[in-house]
Design a protein with these regions (language model features):
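Exposed alpha-helical structural elements
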Residues: 8-12, 69-73, 101, 146
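Conserved catalytic cores of phosphodiester-cleaving nucleases, focusing on short active-site segments
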Residues: 29-65
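Structural alpha-beta junctions
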Residues: 14-21, 78-81, 107-114
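Ordered hydrophobic segments in well-structured contexts
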Residues: 37, 45-50, 84-88, 93-101, ...
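Non-catalytic C-terminal interaction segments of nucleic acid-processing enzymes
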Residues: 99-152
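A short, compositionally biased
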Residues: 30-33, 80-81, 123-124
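Catalytic cores of nucleic-acid endonucleases
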Residues: 53-94
Length: 152
């Protein structure tokens, strides 16, 4: 039986592969089971896949201590890597955020990623809205086509 994680990761990879760029995908499972590196002709991206199986908007995501450690390990091992979170919102789509975008909505009083919660919502035919701690809203919306455009 195919797990939700396999199904949803597979959908994300299909969009990435069909984007048209020549890429290499490496599963860095030694760092974290949901961490991947994507190498294109222009950059190297580290991507943490996070999944919400909630059927409708809004989708919640919380970063664990293990994910925080994995992000730090990835950045220490690969100096020039760009980090992204691919927030898979069940079957709706993928809200792709850069590290800088994440930091704009994170609670600055908390450790870097550990315990940070964000909420992603989307109305029909619109972009994703991202809210962080204390209802801090990201200034700009995230277009549905940000995945995989941002990472390649």
């Amino acid at each position: 039986m195919i797990s939700d994680q396999e199904f949803l990761h597979g959908s994300a990879f299909l969009r990435l592969i069909n984007f048209g760029e020549t890429i290499t995908i490496t599963h860095v499972s030694s760092i974290h089971p949901s961490m991947y590196m994507v190498t294109s002709s222009t950059k190297v991206s580290g991507i943490l896949f996070k999944i919400s199986t909630k059927i409708r908007s809004a989708w919640s995501f919380t970063f664990s201590e293990q994910e925080d450690a994995a992000i730090n390990t990835l950045k220490n091992q690969y100096e020039d890597i760009c980090f992204f979170a691919a927030l898979i919102c069940h079957k709706d789509g993928i809200c792709c955020l850069s590290e800088d975008q994440l930091l704009t909505v994170f609670d600055s009083d908390s450790p870097r990623f550990t315990g940070q919660r964000i909420s992603v919502s989307r109305k029909s035919n619109s972009s994703y809205h991202v809210n962080g701690a204390k209802r801090v809203r990201m200034e700009r919306t995230v277009p549905q086509n940000a995945w995989p455009k941002l990472v390649v």
